[in-house]
Amino acid sequence: MQKRELIYEGKGKKMYATDDANLLIAEFKDDLTAFDAQKRGNEAGKGALNNKISTQIFKILKEKGIETDLVETISDTEQLVKKCEIIPLEVVVRNIATGSLTKRLAIKEGTVLPFPLVEFYFKNDELHDPLVTDEHCLVMGLVKSEKDLQTLRHLAREINSILFKFFEERKLKLVDFKIEFGMDKDGNILLADEISPDSCRFWDADTNEKLDKDRFRQDLGSVKVAYEEVLRRILS
């Protein structure tokens, strides 16, 4: 597969065209960002770890019937993925209160929520990715129909159900996570982007030690060491 021109660069990945119009190459970066990219850093090996972790998680989900954009891993930092039109929503699933939820609603940090909370955020850097309702999504044309919203919410809950149990068995609390979806050329909704410690919060089940990008946000120590531990538990 021939890598061609760079078509998009985000905070954590670069996307390249290939000689197949239906496939792209996603390259994971070592860059670290937080607080709308106001805080920046870099840790060698982080991109390769995210590639390995996300690949494993997508394979687990695929085995459970969740359709994804992943075709195969082609190098330490690269994946071959299906080209799809990314739906401009970040879908966040929360199991335990932390981060912006505690600030917005004054819910005590660490509160176990009575059920998984699914939220939609409009992907827009200038607006700082605001929280949006179903009706906002429809008015703004972020999705094509109410049925698509129902599909996104159903998939998010299903993914959470699968991964919560998987990580619980490996002594990790899946606190919350952000996922993105795309639509392929046939109109099918696919899980896209990544699921990694860059986009999830993982706490050790016994100590509540943070094993995710909050280590960078809060200056808690090496991100790479934490990500290596997450990968070790996934593979255990």
From Swiss-Prot:
Keywords: ATP-binding, Ligase, Nucleotide-binding, Purine biosynthesis. Coiled coil: none annotated. The keyword Electron transport does not apply. HAMAP family: SAICAR_synth. It holds the Pfam family SAICAR_synt. GO terms for biological process: 'de novo' IMP biosynthetic process; cobalamin biosynthetic process. Pathway: Purine metabolism; IMP biosynthesis via de novo pathway; 5-amino-1-(5-phospho-D-ribosyl)imidazole-4-carboxamide from 5-amino-1-(5-phospho-D-ribosyl)imidazole-4-carboxylate: step 1/2. This is Phosphoribosylaminoimidazole-succinocarboxamide synthase. It comes from Campylobacter curvus (strain 525.92). GO terms for molecular function: ATP binding; phosphoribosylaminoimidazolesuccinocarboxamide synthase activity. InterPro entries: SAICAR_synt/ADE2_N (IPR028923), SAICAR_synt_PurC (IPR033934), SAICAR_synth (IPR001636), SAICAR_synthetase (IPR050089), SAICAR_synthetase_CS (IPR018236). It comes from the Bacteria.
